[in-house]
Amino acid sequence: MSNSILNLGSFACLLSLGSIVLWYTISAVLAWYPLRKIPAPSFLATFSYLWLAKTTYSGKQYWIQRDLHKKYGPLVRIGPTDIITDDPEIIKKISSARSSHRRGDWYLTGRFNPYYDNMFTMLEPGPHAKAKARTAAAYSGRDMPDLEVGVNAQLQTLIGLMRSKYASNTVKPHQPLLDLGQVSCFFTMDVITRLAFGEEFGYLKEETDQYGFLGEVRELWPRMSTSADTPWIRKFLFSPPFLKVLGPKPTDKTGFGALMAVAEHHVGKRFAPDAKKKEDMLGSFIRHGLNQQECEVEGLFMIVAGTESTASAIRSTLVHVMTCPRVYQKLKTEINLAVEEGKVSSPIKLEEAKLLPFLQAVIYEGIRMRPPLLGLFPKIVPDGGEEFHGMFIPAGTAICMNTSSLLRSTALFGDDAEVYRPERFMELEKSKRGEMERNVELAFGYGQYMCVGKTVAFMELNKSIFEILRAFDLQLLSPAKPCDVLSYGIFLESNMLVKVTESEGTEYK
């Protein structure tokens, strides 16, 4: 009798195992078949997310994705129902104002307060458009006459810190090296918190990572980016049971939870009965009908999304300038001449910076060489499917954007697209230059899915690059290896050590 029971149990186990194997095999074939004609970098990518997860977690995401289309063509399969492209026309079509392509579930990883949606995590075009309309006036500056004033205040703090602690001169010839990787994040964090909540968190003033937030987020980026690119991990991390036990809470002392508490505190003050109206982003949100909870989650998203990405663009621009003497001298000459001829204020205004052609070329080339965001940003093919490059793409397929490859396209940027050369923008007549700049701006999205923080990011870039190089000369400690670089949906640079020397004849006031 016991042997019969054991045999029956063994048979049941084998039957269960066989059923699982059969189910997985059928699922894999069904996933593989619709996109079978689209090349993939690995057989694993045709039926699983193992290749994509490995690529993302490796820290070499940018370099791997940059070379995909050279090997496999304009459409590459990176998952069972996922393809990636660097074709700007496809990217524009699926993101255009009238497109019916909704966002993929990948965007849900942007729930930095994981219990509520923000504008970024709204997947359907309709709700997303409504949310964007309510926040557009704040992000564009239309509702914020003092937008530039807020950036100027943090810029002056940055310049003051560099001058007092790091800048060498005849009186203080041996000052410590500046970690540009760290201080760039302090600057962008103080800018975004000043704009979002009406007061900065004081990262620059204290020269410390308040709440341990920046350090924790840097440690989390490999896991956050990998979970974004791997559906089953993403679903698990955002599941109610997981969040109930291990999700961030406002009572936490560090990280996302601590920042949630800070957002609740600042927003709560603005919804108090005796609160005064202010002309900042939060004030604009309130005037356009966002409730207290919505303001909290939007503010938190702004902080996370707008800090490291913009800081990375600042670092990329400066490090490329510092490692190219020709560009360094041209830019310094343009800056000095603009100051001497009285063409710029102190600090420079954005409208003045836009009139400096080589500064603009340097900024756009810096973004092109190392884009601030590297995420997949998938859009889902609607019912009926569509055809690209002679291949039918069925409904439900996620079309992802390959910014890494797009910004190195020889068709868009010339045969020397691999080379850092800002002069490529200077060589074009006005309309062609504008077209090339707009191609670079695809790094910030397009159409209805354009990054709402683009205006603020360009303001920070223009003002910080000009004013830092107006006030100082910068020299990398190690030009051969300027810093340590990893990419996880974003560039993370560290140990970017710089010797700072006060410039002569271009005093910053």
Swiss-Prot record:
CDD domains found in the cross-reference section: CYP57A1-like
Pathway(s) this gene product operates in, as recorded in its UniProt entry: Hormone biosynthesis
InterPro entries assigned: Cyt_P450 (IPR001128), Cyt_P450_E_grp-I (IPR002401), Cyt_P450_sf (IPR036396), Cytochrome_P450_monoxygenase (IPR050121)
Annotated coiled-coil segments of the chain: none
A Pfam family per the record: p450
Induction (UniProt): Expression is persistently induced 90 minutes after the addition of the ABA precursor mevalonic acid (MVA) to the medium.
GO BP terms: abscisic acid biosynthetic process
Cofactor(s) required for function per UniProt: heme
Keywords: Glycoprotein, Heme, Iron, Metal-binding, Monooxygenase, Oxidoreductase, Signal, Virulence
Transmembrane segments: none
Binding positions for heme per the UniProt entry: 451
Residues the record marks as carrying a glycan: 402, 462
Gene Ontology molecular function, alphabetical: heme binding; iron ion binding; monooxygenase activity; oxidoreductase activity, acting on paired donors, with incorporation or reduction of molecular oxygen
EC number per UniProt: 1.-.-.-
Signal sequence residues: 1-31
Phenotype reported upon loss of the gene: Impairs the production of abscisic acid (ABA).
Keyword match Cell cycle: no
Listed PANTHER family: CYTOCHROME P450 (PTHR24305), CYTOCHROME P450 MONOOXYGENASE (PTHR24305:SF77)
Family under the similarity heading: Belongs to the cytochrome P450 family.
Protein function: Cytochrome P450 monooxygenase; part of the gene cluster that mediates the biosynthesis of abscisic acid (ABA), a phytohormone that acts antagonistically toward salicylic acid (SA), jasmonic acid (JA) and ethylene (ETH) signaling, to impede plant defense responses. The first step of the pathway catalyzes the reaction from farnesyl diphosphate to alpha-ionylideneethane performed by the alpha-ionylideneethane synthase aba3 via a three-step reaction mechanism involving 2 neutral intermediates, beta-farnesene and allofarnesene.
Name of this chain's protein: Cytochrome P450 monooxygenase aba1
Organism field: Botryotinia fuckeliana (strain B05.10)
